[in-house]
C-alpha cells in the first residue's frame, strides 16, 4: 500500500519536473543568446536608410491604391482579396517608422520596447495575412480557369468576405500572446533583444507561432505552384489555338500571369529560409556567438526583402485587375489601347484580369 502511494506521488510530480526541465532548457539557450553581443552597425546605418525608401514608396503607392479601391465596388472575390491585401500593406507600412527610428537609435530606448511588444508583432501578423491573401488570389485565378462559367460558392463575394475575416481573426489571436507574454521589465539593456522581454512561456509561444507561420507559408507556396502550373498550361494552350501573330502582346499577357508567384517568391521565400535557423539559435545553448550574429544579419536582410512586398503588391493590382487600371488617373487616356488589347484574346483576359 505504501509503495502504491509513493508511486502515485512520483507520477504526480513528473509533469511538474518535466515542465521545469523544459523551461530550464529554454532559459539556458536564451541566457547564452543574451550574453552574445550583436554587431548592429549594418542594422543601425544601412537598413534604416533602405527602410526609409521603402516606407516613402510604399505610403505613396498604397495611398494611391486606397483612393482607387474606394471607387471600386466589392462585387467579386478577386476585388475583396485585393482590398484586404491593401489594408494589410497599409498597416505594415505604418509600422515601418517605428522600426526605422528604433534601429537607427534616433529615438529613446523606450521606443524599442514598444517595437518588441507591439509594432513588430503587428508587422508580422499583417505580413502573414498578406501571404495567405496572395494564396487566395492565386486560388481565385485558378478557379477562373477550371470553372470559368460555373457560379460556385467559392467564387461568391460572401465566401471571400468570410474567409478574409477568419484570416484576420486567426492571426490576431495567435499573435496577441506575443504581446502579452513580453511582460518582463524593459531596460536599456533588455530591449536590445526582444527575446529578453519574454519569459519561458513567452519563448515557447514564440517558437510555436513561428512554426505555425512557417506551415502557413510553405502550404501557400506549394499550392500556388500547383495553381500556376495549371494556369501556365492553359495560357500556353490558348496561345497555340489562337492564330494571332502579335507575339509581343502574347508575351506581355503571359508575364502578367506569373506576377503573383514572382512577388511571393522574391519577397517571402528568402525570409522563411533564414527564419528557422535564426529562431532556433535564440533558444539553443549550443549556437556559438559568431553564428548567431550571422543568422541575425541574414534574418534582417531577408526581412527587408519581405518588407518590400508593400511596394510590389501594387504591381499585382496594375497587371491583374482591369478595374483598378481603368480608375488610375494616369491610365485614363489609355482606355482605347486597353480596349483593343482586351479584344485580342478573351480567354487570356479571363485568366489575367479581374
UniProtKB/Swiss-Prot annotation:
SUPFAM superfamilies noted in UniProt: Family A G protein-coupled receptor-like
Domain of life: Eukaryota
Compartment(s) of residence: Cell membrane
Keywords on record: Cell membrane, Disulfide bond, G-protein coupled receptor, Glycoprotein, Membrane, Receptor, Transducer, Transmembrane, Transmembrane helix
Cytoplasmic side: 71-77, 139-161, 233-252, 322-333
Pfam families documented for this protein: 7tm_1 (PF00001)
A GO term from the CC aspect: plasma membrane
Disulfide bond among keywords: yes
Annotated stretches, region: Disordered: 335-354
TM stretches of this protein: 50-70, 78-98, 118-138, 162-182, 212-232, 253-273, 301-321
GO biological process: G protein-coupled receptor signaling pathway
Recorded GO MF terms: G protein-coupled purinergic nucleotide receptor activity
Primary subcellular site in the record, as a coarse category: membrane
Gene3D superfamilies the record matches: Rhodopsin 7-helix transmembrane proteins
Tissue and organ expression note: Strong expression in spleen and adult brain. Lower expression in placenta, lung, liver, spinal cord, thymus, small intestine, uterus, stomach, testis, fetal brain, and adrenal gland. Not detected in pancreas, heart, kidney, skeletal muscle, ovary or fetal aorta. Clearly detected in lymph node and bone marrow, weakly detected in peripheral blood mononuclear cells (PBMC) and in peripheral blood leukocytes (PBL), but not detected in polymorphonuclear cells (PMN). In the brain, detected in all brain regions examined.
Protein's membrane topology: Multi-pass membrane protein
Disulfide bonds: 116-194
Glycosylation sites (chain numbering): 23, 31, 285
Extracellular side: 1-49, 99-117, 183-211, 274-300
Note: Stimulation by ADP in stably transfected CHO cells resulted in inhibition of adenylyl cyclase and the phosphorylation of the MAP kinases MAPK3 and MAPK1 in a pertussis toxin-sensitive way. Inhibition of adenylyl cyclase and phosphorylation of the MAP kinases are transduction mechanisms that involve G(i) proteins.
Family, per entry: Belongs to the G-protein coupled receptor 1 family.
Function as written in the Swiss-Prot or TrEMBL entry: Receptor for ADP. Coupled to G(i)-proteins. May play a role in hematopoiesis and the immune system.
Protein name per its UniProtKB record: P2Y purinoceptor 13
Amino acid at each position: 500500500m505504501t509503495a502504491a502511494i509513493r508511486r502515485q506521488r512520483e507520477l504526480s510530480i513528473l509533469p511538474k519536473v518535466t515542465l521545469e526541465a523544459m523551461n530550464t532548457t529554454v532559459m539556458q539557450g536564451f541566457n547564452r543568446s543574451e550574453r552574445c553581443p550583436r554587431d548592429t552597425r549594418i542594422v543601425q546605418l544601412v537598413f534604416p536608410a533602405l527602410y526609409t525608401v521603402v516606407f516613402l514608396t510604399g505610403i505613396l503607392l498604397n495611398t494611391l491604391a486606397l483612393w482607387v479601391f474606394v471607387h471600386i465596388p466589392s462585387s467579386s472575390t478577386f476585388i475583396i482579396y485585393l482590398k484586404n491585401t491593401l489594408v494589410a500593406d497599409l498597416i505594415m507600412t505604418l509600422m515601418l517608422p517605428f522600426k526605422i527610428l528604433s534601429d537607427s537609435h534616433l529615438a529613446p530606448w523606450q521606443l524599442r520596447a514598444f517595437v518588441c511588444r507591439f509594432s513588430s508583432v503587428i508587422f508580422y501578423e499583417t505580413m502573414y495575412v498578406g501571404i495567405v491573401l496572395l494564396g487566395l488570389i492565386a486560388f481565385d485565378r485558378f478557379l477562373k480557369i477550371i470553372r470559368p462559367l460555373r457560379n460556385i460558392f467559392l467564387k461568391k463575394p460572401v465566401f471571400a468576405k468570410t474567409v478574409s475575416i477568419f484570416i484576420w481573426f486567426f492571426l490576431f489571436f495567435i499573435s496577441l500572446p506575443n504581446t502579452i507574454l513580453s511582460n518582463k521589465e524593459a531596460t536599456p539593456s533588455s530591449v536590445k533583444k526582444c527575446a529578453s522581454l519574454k519569459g519561458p512561456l513567452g519563448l515557447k509561444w514564440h517558437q510555436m507561432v513561428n512554426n505555425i507561420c512557417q506551415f502557413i507559408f510553405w502550404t501557400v507556396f506549394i499550392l500556388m505552384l500547383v495553381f500556376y502550373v495549371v494556369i501556365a498550361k492553359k495560357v500556353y494552350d490558348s496561345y497555340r489555338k489562337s492564330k494571332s501573330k502579335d507575339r509581343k502582346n502574347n508575351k506581355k499577357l503571359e508575364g502578367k500571369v506569373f506576377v503573383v508567384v514572382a512577388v511571393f517568391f522574391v519577397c517571402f521565400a528568402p525570409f522563411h529560409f533564414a527564419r528557422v535557423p535564426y529562431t532556433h539559435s535564440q533558444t539553443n545553448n549550443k549556437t556559438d556567438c559568431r553564428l548567431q550574429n550571422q543568422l541575425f544579419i541574414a534574418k534582417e536582410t531577408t526581412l527587408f526583402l519581405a518588407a518590400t512586398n508593400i511596394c510590389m503588391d501594387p504591381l499585382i493590382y496594375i497587371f491583374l485587375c482591369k478595374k483598378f487600371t481603368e480608375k488610375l488617373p494616369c491610365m485614363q487616356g489609355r482606355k482605347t489601347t486597353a480596349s483593343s488589347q482586351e479584344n485580342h484574346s478573351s480567354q487570356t483576359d479571363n485568366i489575367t484580369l479581374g
